[in-house]
């Protein structure tokens, strides 16, 4: 219904194989025995030898020869040839350099050059011609191309059909995670790649934090105690943990334990639950220190009982507030774009970044980006979340997020509000616990929204939009976040790996039900366990080495306990507004709800400045005036890193997340450029500060603590004594704007040097028109 089919690939000359030159004559396919590295439960279903992976479109001299393999987990290209032009590779322990998980594949296109035929392959389809070329379009914007010039035609056809079949399963239990976990239970083996696997539940298992050696586990909110600790952490004295949904007896799309107002009895909740869509009772999210609470709730479908139940719920929330403040209700369905609109915007964004040749889009790049509406929607979610922060923080009102089912838009808004209000959720462990609480356990439909089973009518990238909005905050307040944008990008990539239970199911109940059925069919004894225990995405040691995980750390971050010394005295850290700003121009004089007013919008037609939507009907002029005053006062003061942060949401401040959307486009790389250069220098400084701090602690401490300090591992990837940095005055040659990802080996297009897009990637102001860019020196 609301999804758009992936855009059909454009087969222009830049996609066709180049004229054969002496390069091909001189490059003989290597005849060697190449074997894949398989995970437990992974099996090879088809393979073909003498395959050529295309590295560039204008020459074949960089192409690699090897074997193309399709397993029940990934497609893998195995070669002995070194990757040309590549200076650095960020290795995932689960995937090889040329591997693509099956759940990351969006579209498979086969081509026959001689017959000038092409076909988009679906599951269980027949292929009437022998393919000479295979093009794989990935969900993360990668395009990978293989040639079968020297391969057996039947073998090439079979491997193409196998990839199409296994990348588009129709049943949840056909996803690789089930085979992996089943093998683990049968073999009683708790290791993967030699690293112990997580023992957590289907929500993903607690896992350690991103840093090497971190012992802080991510709470999964699968138990009573996790919710109770969160109540105590936030000081929500008027709320209690309720267990009426144990065994999912009330709702199959809520967690077994929920937090409700203390004044509501279990019996009342059971009666009320029948009136809500999906029986999704009000679900507590978070409480402010002033007593105001953030609550999410589905619509009341019983029209006759709607007023009565709504009044009872609001009264209970009011009683839970120490000041008995009123409740502010936000109807997200009326305020924000729906999931269909978000999906349509993402499809347009992907088509702009991937499918169209740059020569055809260069003159209309800025207006085309604006027309996707992706940045507009990111801005809309940030703006509305900031307005709710005002209600909670300044007005001391409890906020109820109301949505038809309460498991899509409310996930994103509730998470953004908490990131803005609570510095704990800006740490790595806190951010992971937030995703567990507001997405995984609250019933966000990862299976459908990520389209793991190729049901495109239910697909919508709301989780990516949340990560994008979080990146906007990180970009504006870099010192307020413990994690880096690399962490956010890798987190998004992990949703496309069908090994982790975290991003595999529509609800905790579905995980328990499906895994129990699978265990019975495979004669697996579960004992007292509630379903199979899937690997945890939060156990990052499954995917990356301790050294690589240090790239998750943000060198800008100033922890709450970190002091700074001024004039010989220790003071808490506070940044001025000027030093905080990473924006392209100052804040305009007329600020309205965090955006510039109509009279200050630039009139340029191709501008990316996004015009404000009309304010919600429920807001009065007085509320608008109060909100405007709150934002104006907040932005006039120095920002407190350990308090509230608010986004600047004018068009000049909402940017395209280049690392996420352009990292696989070779032409978009800026060698020795991009934000990574600043990241590199600041990492060196942060590492030096850490070393000096350890030395000071060793001087002041006893032998035991001094010994511990000496063993402390650097939290920075780049450090003065590390293997990746020998000259502190220079920049490593492998750095580029795509770091730590390498786009080499993905489908290349013609050069874009000198075009508006290349200037945009180099940091040109996005509100300038094509004509202005053309006139720049």
Swiss-Prot record:
Phosphoserine: residues carrying this PTM: 607, 751
Segments of this protein annotated with the region Disordered: 196-217
MF terms in GO: phosphatidylinositol-3-phosphate phosphatase activity
Annotated ranges, domain Myotubularin phosphatase: 221-661
InterPro entries: MTMR10_PH-GRAM, MTMR10_PTP, MTMR12-like_C, Myotubularin, Myotubularin-like_Pase_dom, PH-like_dom_sf, Prot-tyrosine_phosphatase-like
Pfam families: 3-PAP, Myotub-related
GO cellular component terms, semicolon-separated: cytoplasm; cytosol; membrane
Domain of life: Eukaryota
UniProt KW Phosphoprotein keyword: yes
Gene Ontology BP, a term: phosphatidylinositol dephosphorylation
Keywords: Phosphoprotein
Gly residues bias (residue ranges): 197-214
The family this protein is said to belong to: Belongs to the protein-tyrosine phosphatase family. Non-receptor class myotubularin subfamily.
Protein's UniProt name: Myotubularin-related protein 10
Lineage of producing organism: Eukaryota, Metazoa, Chordata, Craniata, Vertebrata
């Amino acid at each position: 219904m609301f999804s758009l089919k992936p855009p059909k690939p454009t087969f222009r000359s830049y996609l066709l194989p180049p004229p054969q030159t002496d390069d091909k004559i001189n490059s003989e396919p290597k005849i060697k025995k190449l074997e894949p590295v398989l995970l437990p439960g992974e099996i090879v279903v088809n393979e073909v030898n003498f395959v050529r992976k295309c590295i560039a479109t204008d020459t074949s001299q960089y192409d690699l020869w090897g074997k193309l393999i399709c397993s029940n987990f990934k497609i893998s290209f195995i070669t002995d040839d070194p990757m040309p032009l590549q200076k650095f590779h960020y290795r995932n322990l689960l995937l090889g350099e040329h591997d693509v998980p099956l759940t990351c594949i969006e579209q498979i296109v086969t081509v026959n050059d001689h017959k000038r035929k092409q076909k988009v392959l679906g599951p269980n389809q027949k292929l009437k011609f022998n393919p000479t070329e295979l093009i794989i379009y990935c969900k993360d914007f990668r395009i990978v191309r293989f040639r079968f010039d020297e391969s057996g035609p039947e073998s090439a056809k079979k491997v193409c059909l196998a990839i199409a079949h296994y990348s588009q399963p129709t049943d949840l239990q056909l996803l690789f995670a089930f085979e992996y976990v089943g093998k683990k239970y049968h073999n009683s083996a708790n290791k993967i790649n030699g690293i112990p696997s997580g023992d957590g539940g289907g929500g993903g298992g607690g896992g350690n934090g991103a840093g090497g050696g971190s012992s802080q586990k991510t709470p999964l909110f699968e138990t009573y105690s996790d919710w109770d600790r969160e109540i105590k952490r936030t000081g929500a004295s008027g709320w209690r943990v309720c267990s009426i949904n144990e065994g999912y007896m009330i709702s199959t799309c809520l967690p077994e334990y929920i937090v409700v107002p203390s004044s509501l009895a279990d019996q009342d909740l059971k009666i009320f639950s029948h009136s809500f869509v999906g029986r999704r009772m009000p679900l507590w999210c978070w409480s402010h220190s002033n007593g105001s609470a953030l609550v999410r709730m589905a619509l009341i479908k019983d029209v006759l009982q709607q007023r009565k139940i709504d009044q009872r719920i609001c009264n209970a929330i009011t009683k839970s507030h120490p000041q008995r403040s009123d409740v502010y209700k936000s109807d997200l369905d009326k305020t924000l774009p729906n999931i269909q609109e978000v999906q349509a915007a993402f499809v347009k964004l992907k088509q702009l970044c991937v499918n169209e040749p740059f020569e055809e889009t260069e003159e209309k790049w800025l207006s085309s980006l604006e027309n996707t509406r992706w940045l507009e929607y990111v801005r809309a979610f940030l703006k509305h979340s900031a307005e709710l922060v005002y209600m909670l923080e300044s007005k001391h009102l409890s906020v109820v997020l109301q949505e038809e089912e309460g498991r899509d838009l409310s996930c994103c808004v509730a998470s953004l509000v908490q990131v803005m209000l609570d510095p704990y959720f800006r740490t790595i462990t806190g951010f992971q616990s937030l995703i567990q609480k507001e997405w995984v356990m609250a019933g966000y439909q990862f299976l459908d929204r990520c389209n793991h089973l190729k049901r495109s009518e239910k697909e919508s990238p709301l989780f990516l939009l949340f990560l994008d909005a979080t990146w906007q905050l990180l970009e504006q307040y870099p010192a307020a976040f413990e994690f880096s944008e690399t962490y956010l990008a890798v987190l998004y990539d992990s949703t496309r790996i069908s090994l982790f239970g975290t991003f595999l199911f529509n609800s905790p109940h579905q995980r328990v039900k499906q895994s129990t059925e699978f265990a019975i069919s495979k004669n697996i004894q579960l004992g007292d366990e509630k379903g199979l225990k899937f690997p945890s995405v939060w156990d990052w040691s499954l995917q990356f080495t301790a050294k690589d995980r240090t790239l998750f750390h943000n060198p800008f971050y100033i922890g709450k306990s970190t002091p700074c010394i001024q004039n010989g005295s220790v003071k808490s850290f506070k940044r001025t507004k000027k030093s905080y700003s990473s924006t392209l121009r100052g804040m305009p004089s007329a600020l309205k709800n965090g955006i510039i007013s109509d009279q200050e919008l630039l009139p340029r037609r191709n501008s990316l400045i996004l015009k404000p939507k009309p304010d919600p009907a429920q807001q009065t002029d007085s509320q608008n005036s109060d909100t405007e005053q709150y934002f104006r006062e907040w932005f006039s003061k120095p920002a407190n890193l350990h308090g509230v942060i608010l986004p600047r949401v004018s068009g000049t401040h909402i940017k395209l997340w280049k690392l996420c959307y352009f990292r696989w486009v070779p032409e978009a790389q800026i060698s020795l450029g991009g934000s990574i250069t600043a990241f590199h220098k600041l990492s060196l400084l942060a590492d030096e500060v850490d070393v000096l701090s350890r030395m000071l602690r060793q001087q002041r401490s006893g032998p035991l603590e001094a010994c511990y300090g000496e063993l402390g591992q650097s939290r920075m990837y780049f450090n003065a004594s590390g293997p990746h940095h020998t000259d502190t005055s220079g920049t490593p040659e492998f750095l580029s704007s795509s770091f730590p990802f390498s786009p080499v080996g993905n489908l290349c297009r013609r050069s874009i040097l000198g075009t508006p897009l290349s200037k945009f990637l180099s940091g040109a102001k996005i509100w300038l028109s094509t004509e202005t860019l053309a006139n720049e020196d």
